Regions:
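Short nucleic-acid-contacting surface segments enriched for D/E, G, S/T with interspersed K/R
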Residues: 79-94
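OB-fold/S1-family single-stranded nucleic acid-binding modules
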Residues: 100-124
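Short, structured beta-strand/loop micro-motifs enriched in basic residues and often containing a Trp
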Residues: 70-79
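Bacterial N-terminal signal peptides
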Residues: 8-18
Length: 133
């Protein structure tokens, strides 16, 4: 009987821990479709577990808006050749990303085109660049 109780408790703990971990890796707060934006790099944070690129984008009225672009972690980006010197403040970049569902200025990066026209998958999927980007 003691074994069944211990096994039951183990299963309950495993399920209780698995749900928050799965939720952390959900992309449910982003829309499913891609959007393209162009802006000027303000900050780059190549960190774990997720890297961030902050860019200034002009809105419909020409007013500058700060956008936060979420990417895979530093280690995943290093594997595709992204280093601390890859993007610099002042660089103009283009991003193909999934916009936040609430409409705020943020997105989950898919592809990023740097100032030299090089395109990389910043979502960690190692996908080939789309032909129309």
């Amino acid at each position: 009987m003691r074994f069944k109780s211990a096994l039951g408790l183990t299963v309950i703990c495993a399920v209780a821990l698995a749900v928050p971990l799965r939720a952390h890796h959900s992309h449910g707060n982003y829309v499913d479709t891609f959007m393209d934006i162009t802006g000027v790099v303000k900050e780059v944070h190549l960190v774990v577990p997720h890297s961030w690129v902050y860019i200034e984008v002009k809105d419909e009225k020409g007013e500058p808006q700060m956008w936060a672009l979420e990417a895979t972690g530093r280690v995943g980006l290093q594997k595709i050749g992204v280093t601390a010197d890859y993007l610099k403040p002042g660089d103009t970049i283009k991003a193909r990303c999934h916009h936040l569902r609430d409409g705020s200025n943020g997105c989950l990066l898919g592809f990023l085109k740097d100032k030299n026209g090089d395109v990389k998958d910043w979502d960690g999927n190692n996908a080939p660049p789309p032909a129309d980007f």
